[in-house]
Amino acid sequence: MSIKLTPTWFIKEYSSISIEFLKKQSIKTIFADIDNTLVDWDELDTNDTLQTWVQQLKENHIEIILVSNNRKNRIERVAEQLGVPYVFPGLKPLHKGFKEALSQTTATKDEIVMIGDQLLTDILGAGTFGIKTILVKPLKLSDAKKTRINRFFENLILTILYGKNYSEKWEEKIHD
C-alpha cells in the first residue's frame, strides 16, 4: 500500500518543474489539481506565474488537463482563464476522473504525470491508476474545512513513511 502513497517526486511548487525535466521524463501530459496546487484554495483567479508556466507548457507541446474535486463553476473558471481542458467530477482518489482525462489525450499512462498537493486524493488516485506523481507543498498553510481531516492523516502517513523530517524530501526545483 505504501507504494501507492509514495509520490514519484516531491517538489515545493508547480512553477519549479521545468520543461527540460518533463521532456527528460517523456511527459507529454500533466493532470493537475487546482486548489492549493495551482491556485490558493481561497482565491478565485489564477496569477501571472501560473499563466506563464502554462503558456510555456503549451509552447513546448505539453498539455495540461485539470482534474479537481471542486465545484464545476470553480473548475470551469480556472480552466477558462488558463485555456485548458478539465474533468468534472474528478472524484479523486477514484479512477473516474483519471479515465476521463486519459480519454482527452493521446498520451499513454507512461507519458502522464499528476501534480497535486494531497496524498490521499491526488497521489493515491493517480498512483493506483498507474501514472507518475508529483506531490507539491500546499500553496497556503490553511485549508478548506473539508480538507483539514485529510491533512491530519497525510501528515501522519508521511511521518510514518519518511520520518519526522519528511519536509526535507521536497526538492527546491526539478530541472533536469
Regions flagged by a language model, labelled:
Residues 2-30, 43-44, 51-62, 67, ...:
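Asp-based, Mg2+/Mn2+-dependent phosphohydrolase catalytic module
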